[in-house]
């Protein structure tokens, strides 16, 4: 089932309210929505990078991925199509870019899906409860 960005933005309020430095990659047409949803007192801790998934580095491999799906079919999950795979893999390019640019002079980096609460309200609650534990035990 194909969903556009507005579907995921419906579930972004909790994530965008977290009191953390955030670098947010989004399709250009959603940039203003991100700024509207991110509380104003956190704007100084926010960098939005409007970029289309089509402009991410991994997209150059689309044809190769499509060919791999033909040669090695995998029907377990109907999301197993090139565009979904590219979207998922784009996070690694995005995270690498943030680490290299380091706009907030950070020592720790992580990825969180903007719609984490969509996958279960407890996800965001547990994230907030355990962030210090995660930093202390799983980060350098």
Language-model-detected regions and their locations in the chain:
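Short, charged/polar "capping" segments at the starts of alpha-helices
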Residues: 28-35
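Short internal beta-strands
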Residues: 23-27
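Short, acidic, metal-binding catalytic loop of nucleotide-sugar glycosyltransferases
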Residues: 8-21, 37-40
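Amphipathic alpha-helical segments that form well-ordered structural scaffolds
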Residues: 14, 33, 94-98
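Short coil/turn segments at secondary-structure boundaries
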Residues: 36-38, 123-124
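GT-A fold catalytic core of metal-dependent nucleotide-sugar glycosyltransferases
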Residues: 83, 87-140
